[in-house]
Amino acid sequence: MAKISRLPDTVANKISAGEVVQRPASVVKELLENAIDAGASRITVMIKDAGKELIRIIDNGTGMNREDALLCVERFATSKISVVDDLDTLMSLGFRGEALASISSVSHFELKTRQAFSPLALKFRYEGGALAEESEVSGEEGTSISVRNLFYNVPARRKFLKSNATEFRHIFESVRSLSLAYADIEWRMYNDDEELFHFRNPDIRERLNYYYGSDFSEGLISITEENDYLSIHGFIGKPGMLKRHKADQLFYINRRIIQNRMLSQALQQAYGELLEDRQAPFAMLFLGIDPSRVDVNVHPAKLEVKFEDERSVRNMFYPVVKRAVQLHDFSPDASFVPDQGVQGESIQPEDEALNRRLMYHERPGRMATTAELYTDYRQHSLPQSSGKEHGPQSRQGEFFSAHEPLERWKKEGVEPEGDEVFTTMLQSRFHDDESAAGGGTEPKIWQLHNKYIICQIKNGMMIIDQHVAHERVLYERALDVMNQNVPNSQQLLFPQKIEMRQWEYEVFEEIRDDLYRLGFNLRDFGSKTVMIEGIPQDVRSGTEVTILQDMIAGYQENASKLKLEKRDNLAKSYSCRNAIMAGQKLSLEEMRSLIDNLFATRVPYSCPHGRPVIIKLMLDQLDRMFGRT
């Protein structure tokens, strides 16, 4: 007698359901995709007990005749494909013909459907995958599917479901991702008989504001890019918009929601140092690609895809997002928010004033570009033009040598590329802009406690942390110098000797080539001793020994804790140790030079470690604080 036997369909469907139907949200996703594929222009979602008691999806799509209605609950019965080659032209969301068979096998399943020309709807009821009832009833055009008592006959699976709050969150995220992708569809959702939303208008921003909070969409950057291989459109958000996690990164391929590590990493890298540790920026990005160039049949829930040429996709996706990030003003606004105090204690007005604290929040309103913020500063902080013309890279002070990439490229024959092309374009917008709008003859720039630089802008003030601003300037300059391999060193009149401990000398040996590229001219003097004979232009004479020692220590610390790339690590260590410090008094010329050099950088809004460089305090905020509104 044979030991191997063919499993009955009811058993096979239950096993298959383990892959396709992992939780109530899986059912919702599959049923919604079927409704969309059926051409629905109106979809209603009804949930009870987090999907354990009831999941009902109602659509006004094309409906089905009796033959199709019976076949749709059979395994591997589908109208989407008939031969393997059909996968190369597939644009529908569903195609395998597994979902309804799996769902009906682990629930009390009811399907009601009517085509436009039929006087009555067809109703089919299944118990554990077996047809229990068939009848004709009255009903609207389209299809209604009800899934009751999910996993009633698989108690082990039902036992492992999470709390209602967790399961409903997953359901809500499934509905959210599809309602955002298909804004042309009218969506309505109920939870335990309470209406959550009813989206009548195809306004994607209205939906974003509902899902993420009032005015959320006002802080988004729109992206649109297209070539013969790939199209990209959608939105990305400011760093720190809410406390985001990667569930708020929505990637779509041909309007199919997917999870893709490469796209997520490229997005993260495009934001770079603008993000703090464990931050993930918001994104809702739609990629359009020839379906023959992407395989959607690699995951049971169709959440993952495989690109024919992943490198080409990344090589287009990354610079598009990075360019959008660099073009916009990411400086946070400051708001003064009173502490709530201890419950049960009254706070007197004077105590309330003393207990105000400076907080960061994302200010709603149209996103400003870097160019606009810099132009605003020049118009309202600087006096009327006196004939001298300055760009953001042209001023010099005691601590800030000029950053002149255009002249450097001309002299050295270096072709600008990547970020430098963008920087050049940005600088061309700043140049020759000495507006008289600011009025007066005195620059409206001040230093506060030898720590912060305050500048007047059109509708308020801009506050700059002088240390991290200079750190950003030095960081980008150090990376540029090392990557171009054109050392710029100034020789010391009196070389300095530095004796190193064993670990310091080992680190020095590891980074000595890049130290040379950076501008340090160093010579071995024997017995772990090094002579400093030349230093970078940005290093002040007399500080070279301390800076080199601090750089080596900082490099070692970063290598062990952050595991940074070698040159990035060195540039961070160099800029942090060499930047002007809080408490250092600056002249007006030095402050202007620092601001000009800051706005010549690629990312002026955060230091290399992710801290903010610029904060804006707007007049309307001050007016509210003084009771003027």
Curated annotation (Swiss-Prot):
Coiled-coil residues are: none
Keyword DNA damage assigned to the entry: answer is yes
Q: Which NCBIfam families match?
A: mutl (TIGR00585)
UniProt GO BP: mismatch repair
- Stored HAMAP family: DNA_mis_repair
Query: One GO molecular-function annotation for this sequence?
Result: mismatched DNA binding
Cross-referenced PANTHER family: DNA MISMATCH REPAIR PROTEIN MLH, PMS, MUTL, DNA MISMATCH REPAIR PROTEIN MLH1
GO cellular component terms given for this protein: mismatch repair complex
Which species is listed as the source?
Chlorobium limicola (strain DSM 245 / NBRC 103803 / 6330)
What is this protein called in UniProt?
A: DNA mismatch repair protein MutL
Q: Which InterPro entries does the annotation name? A: DNA_mismatch_repair_CS (IPR014762), DNA_mismatch_repair_MutL (IPR020667), DNA_mismatch_S5_2-like (IPR013507), HATPase_C_sf (IPR036890), MutL/Mlh/PMS (IPR002099), MutL/Mlh/Pms-like (IPR038973), MutL_C (IPR014790), MutL_C_dimsub (IPR042120)
Q: What does this protein do?
A: This protein is involved in the repair of mismatches in DNA. It is required for dam-dependent methyl-directed DNA mismatch repair. May act as a 'molecular matchmaker', a protein that promotes the formation of a stable complex between two or more DNA-binding proteins in an ATP-dependent manner without itself being part of a final effector complex.
Keyword line: DNA damage, DNA repair
The family line of this record is: Belongs to the DNA mismatch repair MutL/HexB family.
Q: Does the keyword DNA repair apply?
A: yes
